[in-house]
Amino acid sequence: MLPTGIIRPPAELELLNHLAAAFITRQAVGDYAPGAPLAAAVEKVHVLDFPSLVPPAAVPNHAADSKNRCVFCGSLYPGLREPGFALELFRALGPASGWPLTMAGGGWQYFAADAAQTKAVLGEQFEQPGPVPAETARTMQAQADVLLNLGNAVANQLPSKLFDYFAAGKPVLHLCVIENDPALPYLARYPLALVLHQGQADAADILHRWLGEVCGKQLPFGEVCDLFPELVPQAVAAEFVRWLM
């Protein structure tokens, strides 16, 4: 399966010339359109969604304390995935909301001023553990009440993390910073999702109400698979067989 993002036409075309077929995500289709860098290989590629719906790891579901938790685990990048909208929302909620925000991962050196401002407002309710091992991240996400997804600022990259969130069955808060966010069609099919758009005047009020409504809710994995039947491993394997046999 070929990635989206940075396109290196000579190298990718050479690779495609040696393949019988290749699978691409929907976000990469434009790279093979007439006049696009990889148009010459359009007959070789087939669209396949993320094959990412697998049962979450068995870890404790709740932390020792009774705090509500909103958790993000991932790296931050200027111009691609920034924390500003999330920090603005949780500053607006304030410490009285009772919702700590935990954002684990690297990249905070680019957003130190915004983080410091948030820490001044939220105090201990804003946690930055830094980069954590994958096992720790899985535990943090399993113990979260709400999972935070930061929408990318480009339309040709869809965070695979989103499908891990769906598989966990937890409420998902998605913060959208572009109109053509590629995650939106998937989020529209997930009943425990809230999408907020940057610049939305009443975003903090909507978030406050939603947090109260979804806290403690969780979808069984089987129900999530029914929502996204094309994303389960069996469906993906069937597509491989259909195109390669």
Where are these regions (language model features)?
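Catalytic binding pocket for nucleotide-activated donors in carbohydrate/polymer assembly enzymes
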Residues: 142-230
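Carbohydrate-associated surface elements
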Residues: 28, 50-51
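Active-site proximal beta-strand in glycosyltransferases
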Residues: 1-5
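Short hydrophobic "strand-cap" motifs at the C-terminus of beta-strands
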Residues: 25, 72-75, 104, 129
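Nucleotide-sugar donor-binding and catalytic loop/hinge architecture
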Residues: 38-42, 54-71, 93-96
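Nucleotide-activated donor-binding/catalytic signature segment of Leloir-type glycosyltransferases, i.e.
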Residues: 102-107, 112-136
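A short, active-site helix/loop in glycosyltransferases that binds the activated sugar's phosphate group
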Residues: 6-45
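Conserved donor-binding/catalytic core segment of Leloir-type glycosyltransferases
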Residues: 23, 62-81, 90-91
